[in-house]
From Swiss-Prot:
It holds the Pfam family Toprim_2. This is Gene 57 protein. InterPro entries: TOPRIM_DnaG/twinkle (IPR034154), TOPRIM_dom (IPR006171). Residues 57-137 form the Toprim domain. It comes from Mycobacterium phage L5 (Mycobacteriophage L5). Disulfide bonds: none annotated. The gene is 57. CDD domains: TOPRIM_primases. It comes from the Viruses. Signal peptide: none annotated.
Length: 152
């Protein structure tokens, strides 16, 4: 079932075990559908919560694990959600201490809807839209790291 998929681990901190895998999502890389697979019964979680443990004045939020990884590789502390409808009100408290929470919105209607739904719950939110038809990963892949950082 998961053969030919990229395994994306969701990590969790435990004082007894340190960082451990809490869940795994799978990204199909063979072009099949559905594009993403989750283990049955999985809960909505933030991806890359390690970013929340490092000192930073700003934090970014992405829709999608691959966009989150790309933003992190560009030097932006970033957490991600597995989809546009996955923001939960209880996530809010984790982001209130930052100067800015940059919501890196995909360049489509769903991306802007995601960004607005998150932004309305955070007083320190800034929506950073990607160009039409682009997401963080495609922007950096086609135009380089500077293209993303200039938008911030």
């Amino acid at each position: 079932m998961y053969r030919g998929c990229l395994a994306i681990p969701y990590m969790r901190w435990s004082p007894w075990r340190h960082w451990t895998v809490a869940a795994i999502r799978y990204r199909r890389i063979d072009g099949g559908t559905p594009k993403y697979l989750s283990m049955p019964g999985e809960k909505d979680r933030l991806y890359n919560t390690y970013a929340l443990t490092k000192y930073s004045k700003d934090m970014a939020i992405c829709e999608g694990e691959l966009d989150t990884i790309t933003a992190e590789l560009c030097g932006l502390p970033t957490v991600g959600l597995s989809g546009a409808q996955k923001w939960k009100p209880y996530f809010r408290e984790l982001f209130l201490g930052y100067r800015n929470v940059n919501i890196l919105a995909d360049g489509d209607d769903a991306g802007m809807e995601f960004a607005r739904s998150v932004a309305k719950t955070l007083p320190n939110a800034r929506i950073i839209p990607m160009p039409e038809g682009e997401d963080v990963n495609s922007l950096v892949t086609s135009q380089g790291k500077a293209a993303l950082l200039e938008r911030i």
